A protein has these predicted regions:
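A "functional boundary" signal
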Residues: 2-4, 10-154
Length: 154
């Protein structure tokens, strides 16, 4: 009987130690917020410098995509700007299959911004039967995220 009472207390103590360690790690990360922000800003600045010096449409597209990723959970309106730039340069690439990826990324940015209905409208433009395996996965993940955000919001 004594063991039945002590054993759960022992497990609780171990979990408490683990929780303290996790909280300490989180506190350490939060205390370095400014450092992480400076790193992110440097990465974004470096990408913009490369973009300013690039004349190749393929390279510009890649840089727009990188800027989208760098901005998505940082400044989603800027992420949306670079997605729109990708769409503008798309005709020069002669790769129409990228249009669906751009639409999915636009929907993702809109969802992050709280524009859930607009995000769903973007996704509705896509015929999933036309997507390759990777893009189809991204399509459904974005739909799932939008429905999750809508559920959280309502």
């Amino acid at each position: 009987m004594f063991l039945l009472l002590v054993s759960p207390l022992s497990l609780f103590a171990k979990h408490t130690d683990l929780n303290k360690a996790v909280l300490k790690k989180l506190d350490d990360i939060i205390s370095k917020k400014e450092t992480y922000q400076i790193q992110r800003e440097k990465e974004i600045t470096d990408l913009k410098v490369q973009l300013a010096h690039s004349t190749d449409p393929v390279r510009k597209y890649e840089l727009y995509a990188s800027l989208f990723g760098a901005y998505l959970h940082y400044q989603a309106d800027s992420a949306l700007h670079y997605i729109n730039r990708e769409m503008e340069i798309l005709p020069q690439l002669n790769r129409p299959e990228l249009e669906n990826e751009i639409i999915i990324n636009r929907a993702t940015a809109m969802g992050v911004m709280g524009m859930y209905i607009e995000a769903m409208e973007q996704l509705a433009k896509i015929n999933p039967k036309e997507l390759n395996e990777w893009t189809l996965l991204s399509y459904y993940q974005t739909y799932r995220a939008c429905y999750g955000w809508l559920a959280d919001y309502t």
